[in-house]
Structures are given as C-alpha cells and as structure tokens.
C-alpha cells in the first residue's frame, strides 16, 4: 500500500559510483540506469536526480554547471538529462584517470563524499530525500544525515565495505570526532564507509527480502550482522527486489538475436548459438558471470565432468585467473565453450540460445542473470540464496540448497530430465517469460518509503 502522498513535489537524489550508460562495471550501474527513470515516469511531479563521479572515461559529455574550490582542491559539476532524469557528475582530480575503480578508492570516495553536498549547494540542488547506494555513497549519507536530510541507504553487496585504517583515514572524512566511535563509522580499528551508510541512514534497504534476512546472520553479515539485526528490530531494514530493464532485455525486439515472443521461437536462437560455438545437438546449460568465489563458478568447474554427459556447457565471464585458466583448458572439450571477458551482444545470444542457466552462487544479494534468463525463456538452475529464492519459482527453475558441485549436478540432472518432456519444459519456459520483473513495482515501493520518511522524525543513530 502506498503511503499518504507527500504534500509537495518530492526532490529525490540518488548517489552512486556508477550509472548506466555513462559509467558501468556491473549490476549497480544497471540499477541506477533504470530505477530513477522509472520513478520519474511513475511520479511526474517528483524531481529525480542522480549524482555520480565525473570519470575521465565517462561515456558522455556533461555540460559544466559550476567550477570552484572545495577543501583545497578544484571541483566541478556537470549535467546531462535523459529519460526525465537529471544526471549530475562531480569532478575531482582523483577521478581523472582511466577506469572506474582503483586501490585508493577509500580515499577517492571520501573526497567525493566530502565535496558532494557543498557542490550541490553551489548549484542550488537541495533534495528532500537522499538515496545512497553501496559503500561509495556511505559518507554522503552520513553528511546528509548531519544536515537533517532524510536518507535511504541501499546495500547491493555487503561484502565490499570500503575499509581503511581509521587513524590514517579519519582526516579524509570531514566528520565530527564523535562519529568515529563503534556506533558510528569505526569497525575493528578501521574506517568503514559501508557502516557509515548503515549507521546514519534513516532507513536501509537491500536488493531482495531474503538477502535482508540473511545479512542479519553471522554467515552472511560480513561482521555487521549485529548492527543489521538492530536495524531490523527498529524497523529500519527491509528488502526490495531489483527489477529488470525490460526494454534492454526483450526477446521480441532484441537486435542481437533472431527475435521471438514465445518458447517455441527459441529454437532458432539455440541453433545459432550451437553453430557459433561448434556444439552438438545436446541442450545448452549456460553461465554468464564473474569468475569468482561468490558466484560459485568453482562449483560449476568441478561439476563439468558430470554436466557434459547431458549438456553442452557455455560460459562467458572473466575474473579469477585460476578459474579463467581452468575454463580455458576445458574449452577444448567438444561440449564446452568458454568466452573470456564480458561481451554484451554475446551475452544476449547466450541468454536467448541456452536452454538452462546455472547460478550456483554462494550468496546472491538479488541477481540479474536469472531475471534475464527467464525473460528469454531459459530456465535457471540456482542455489537457494538471496534473491534467487525470491525470484525463481519451483514451477519454473531448479533449485538446490548446498553450495557443492554434487548438489549442482543433481539439480542439473533434474533439469535435464524435465527437458526430455517437451510439454513440461515448454510450460515452464512460458511461465518464466510471463513473470513480471519490471521496475514499476520496486520503484513504487521506494517512492512510498521516501514519502513515509518525510512524514516521520529522524531515528536515533
């Protein structure tokens, strides 16, 4: 249910380290490229702005609005408008190098966090609600709270926290001395910018209801489970599922594939994928993923000798050098194809041409790949964790509980058995393609959260 409408047009400011299509390395950028635009469309009186760094590699040419000196360094702010959203880019010398992320990111995003609100002041931007995303925005959330602004902080992945020795880093933050205690930004002798966001936000969200529960436990809480449990008891932590950009990922209009609108139409995409990689007529089990421990890609690697009995296996990804080398070695097998790195047109062809999609994640805050796979009628084989629990119904996909190669193999066998029954497989695929994972629902929930905060007093930090 929507909260009572705020009495005047809301001004919402999202703050994040990346935003598609201007800067992107992963799912965070995808969220910031989609959610604000949907919010602006759903509530046309709401002013939606996104603030992110002005990287040297930024894909776009913002119009400079302001240039001055803040904290002893030259600072500038630029603007682009797209899809009803105002995108602001904060320029600092620390971000004038190739790429997005670097080993000194804690210091860089402290500079960003200190300069953000003063730079906005200089251009007359005063939000009603500031919505920070992940640790890179944690310090901005803390400074916004100290100004009395209403704040939301979204955890997209708790594993990455933005930590640095507190004695060295305290001077980078611009925070008052009292903020450096255990109830503030201190974490085992370190500055922790994720904890800054958690501690100072009026409300904290994660990107799925199950992940919101998981991170209150020692297994998934990354040392912050005590704080997150307290936030839960205070009613200040909730999970809101991410959505999917259904224009960007649409099998009916996708320019990278032979378009189709129902499961029967996948046959052409499947034939194209097998031909591209020189595979036989066995069904295709695919993975498009970072090659990382979190994603369970070592489990997929260990399971390969069993999987290739039933499946062609196609993997697209990069990351861990050892896993990359191992998958490269397996690519000589006639039923295994491996493409290193990330290639979006190829990813589209894989999502469309595969029959099943493996996500053996050890943890998965929300997950985007399973949403894309189902949109294309490709059935997920997933471990029961985080957003995979919330998004993959038993009637569609194949789920397993233990993070082992054996459990993945068994679930894949169940998927293969279902594939042998075309009527069952087509019914599952049709249901998958009918599921609504658009951003409209999540966008409404965030807008309702903002409205509720504007009608309440600040909680105690």
Question: Where is each model-derived feature located?
Answer:
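Catalytic cores of nucleotide-sugar-dependent glycosyltransferases that transfer UDP/GDP/TDP-activated
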Residues: 2-461
């Amino acid at each position: 249910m929507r909260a009572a409408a705020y009495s005047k047009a809301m001004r919402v400011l999202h703050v994040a380290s990346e935003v598609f299509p201007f800067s992107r390395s992963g799912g965070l950028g995808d969220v910031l490229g989609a959610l604000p635009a949907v919010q602006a469309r759903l509530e046309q009186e709401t002013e939606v702005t996104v603030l992110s760094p002005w990287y040297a590699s930024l894909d776009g040419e913002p119009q400079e609005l302001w240039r001055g000196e803040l904290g002893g360094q030259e600072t500038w702010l630029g603007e682009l408008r797209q899809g009803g959203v105002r995108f602001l880019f904060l320029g600092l010398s620390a971000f004038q190098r190739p790429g997005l992320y670097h080993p000194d990111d804690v210091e860089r995003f402290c500079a960003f966090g200190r300069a953000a609100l003063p730079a906005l002041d200089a251009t007359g931007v005063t939000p009603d609600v500031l919505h920070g995303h992940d640790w890179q925005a944690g310090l901005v959330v803390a400074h916004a709270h100290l100004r009395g602004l209403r704040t939301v902080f979204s955890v997209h992945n708790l594993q990455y926290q933005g930590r640095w020795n507190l004695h060295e880093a305290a001077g980078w933050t611009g925070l008052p001395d009292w903020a450096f205690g255990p109830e503030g930004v201190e974490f085992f002798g370190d500055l922790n910018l994720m904890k800054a966001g958690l501690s100072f936000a009026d409300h904290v969200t994660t990107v799925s209801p199950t992940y919101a529960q998981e991170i209150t436990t020692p297994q998934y809480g990354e040392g912050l489970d005590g704080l997150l449990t307290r936030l839960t008891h205070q009613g200040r932590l909730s999970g809101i599922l991410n959505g999917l950009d259904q224009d960007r990922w649409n099998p009916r209009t996708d320019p990278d594939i032979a378009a189709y609108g129902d499961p029967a139409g996948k046959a052409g995409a499947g034939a194209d994928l097998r031909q591209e990689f020189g595979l036989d007529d066995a069904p295709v089990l695919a993975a498009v993923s970072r090659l990382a421990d979190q994603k369970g890609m070592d489990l997929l690697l260990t399971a390969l000798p069993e999987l290739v009995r039933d499946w062609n296996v196609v993997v697209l990804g990069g990351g861990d050098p050892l896993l990359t080398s191992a998958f490269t070695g397996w690519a000589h097998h006639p039923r295994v194809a491996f493409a290193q790195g990330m290639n979006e047109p190829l990813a589209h062809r894989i999502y469309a041409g595969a029959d099943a999609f493996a996500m053996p994640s050890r943890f998965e805050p929300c997950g985007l790949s399973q949403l894309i796979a189902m949109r294309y009628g490709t059935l997920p084989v997933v471990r029961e964790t985080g957003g995979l629990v919330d998004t993959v119904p038993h009637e569609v996909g194949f789920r397993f509980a233990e993070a082992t190669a054996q459990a993945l193999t068994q679930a894949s066998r169940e998927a293969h058995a279902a594939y042998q029954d075309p009527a069952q497989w087509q019914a599952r695929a049709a249901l998958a393609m009918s599921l609504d994972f658009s951003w409209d629902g999540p966008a409404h929930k965030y807008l309702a959260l903002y409205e509720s905060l504007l009608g309440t007093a600040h909680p105690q930090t």
